[in-house]
């Protein structure tokens, strides 16, 4: 008798995705982050659902409803901090997942890569709107500053901003719609992740060498299920340690002050995972230029496959490209640091240099270096 998991209409989808999936035998722990992102999404949806049961999206009561969750709801503080710090873990996994894709040439799977870029945008939008919901000082002013950037769009800018606000400033209408979008987007992200997996399973996984691995495949279960479980346990260990020992480590103290439109905080800055993009935005003195640079800092990922000039897919055997990759990582860490600093000397010039280097590395230096490495192979 044929196994039920191979014949049942639903079970065979699960079987071909997570059990009998042929996987390369040499994929390293850098390939764990896909499953970790899935776990992060599940954690965020579950904790978010329980938070939504107690949260009110009204300017008069939003802040106090979050306080009520932390003080009066059973384990409300735990749910709230799991959700807030779960977002940080989500972004850590995202950045490592994207970095892995860049290093090992996974971007050569165009459909999978482009849906991944779309997913990154969707998660960033969700996180931004979620940050507005507690209605603290940084929530309000962050929303004001970021939505205001759209006014830089010629002709329709100011109308667009008022349309998004639902009035003439960030107010009740804005908060209500942000809550609605923040609730629906994770489900859209889950659907997109399904499509992301669908396209990945059309081609099969890449591997560290970047060479075809059809001749050497192993079943996903038990090898990679066990490996993924180890990753999940480490993720949960990191998240619970953060939540139980220093839940406010990555937050902003200003967000414990209720939103006040009449009092601007001295330093408006987003959560740590947006700081690199915020630094790029601030490094250009022109408003429209800054907005374009901000959008391009993420959109540039969609261009990466077309800038691949190397004869080899992975960077495993390309030491010069490896050096440039780690310079890019250091540059992004520098931008993250600059994004959290005040706009004054020497931070302004450091931010501008780091922003220029970011775009130069991806658009010019890395493709030229790849061509140089191709010529090295001839010698």
UniProtKB/Swiss-Prot annotation:
Gene Ontology BP terms: mitochondrial electron transport, ubiquinol to cytochrome c
Binding residues for heme b b566: 97, 196
GO CC annotations, alphabetized: mitochondrial inner membrane; respiratory chain complex III
Keyword vocabulary terms for this entry: Electron transport, Heme, Iron, Membrane, Metal-binding, Mitochondrion, Mitochondrion inner membrane, Respiratory chain, Transmembrane, Transmembrane helix, Transport, Ubiquinone
UniProt-listed InterPro entries: Cyt_b/b6_C (IPR005798), Cyt_b/b6_C_sf (IPR036150), Cyt_b/b6_N (IPR005797), Cytb/b6-like_sf (IPR027387), Cytochrome_b (IPR030689), Cytochrome_b_C_euk/bac (IPR048260), Cytochrome_b_N_euk/bac (IPR048259), Di-haem_cyt_TM (IPR016174)
Single Gene Ontology MF annotation: metal ion binding
Membrane topology, record value: Multi-pass membrane protein
Cofactor field: heme b
Regions crossing the membrane: 33-53, 77-98, 113-133, 178-198, 226-246, 288-308, 320-340, 347-367
Subunit field text: The cytochrome bc1 complex contains 11 subunits: 3 respiratory subunits (MT-CYB, CYC1 and UQCRFS1), 2 core proteins (UQCRC1 and UQCRC2) and 6 low-molecular weight proteins (UQCRH/QCR6, UQCRB/QCR7, UQCRQ/QCR8, UQCR10/QCR9, UQCR11/QCR10 and a cleavage product of UQCRFS1). This cytochrome bc1 complex then forms a dimer.
Function according to Swiss-Prot or TrEMBL: Component of the ubiquinol-cytochrome c reductase complex (complex III or cytochrome b-c1 complex) that is part of the mitochondrial respiratory chain. The b-c1 complex mediates electron transfer from ubiquinol to cytochrome c. Contributes to the generation of a proton gradient across the mitochondrial membrane that is then used for ATP synthesis.
Protein's name according to its UniProt entry: Cytochrome b
Species of provenance: Sorex raddei
Lineage: Eukaryota, Metazoa, Chordata, Craniata, Vertebrata
Gene assigned in the entry: MT-CYB
